[in-house]
Amino acid sequence: MCGIFGSTEKQKFITLYNLNKKRGNFAVGTLFLNQSTMVIRKFEGVVEPVRLFKNEEEVDFQMYLGHTQAPTSAKRDYSFNTSHPFEYGDWVIAHNGVLTNFGEIKNEFDSKWKNPVDSSIIPLLFSSLKNILKIMKNKM
């Protein structure tokens, strides 16, 4: 089972990462945010915390999010594109679970969606919903 964790403090984030390493040792992904910077990092397997922050040590982030991955679907090789977090438009997500209707969703929203990971389509869904709500608001 995957681990999803986050903190507003770097040291607490590192502690949470160390506690979640065993929950998913296939890959680790991170999202670091402040008002002007968003950094997404992904690594195969378990890495030392210092690698998560390489080149960002001097940046003062306000939010640290992480995901340790243990794939629940078919066996696959590590790839940046098939590891959390997933990004589309304004949305970045990490998800723990299985979308049992992934095939239907994929066909409904974008039959050319190439990513085999079910969770990867969630930010596309959010982005589509945002666009629909914007259209509805403009029609009122």
Language-model segment annotations:
Residues 1-140:
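Conserved short alpha-helical segments that host acidic/polar catalytic motifs at enzyme active sites
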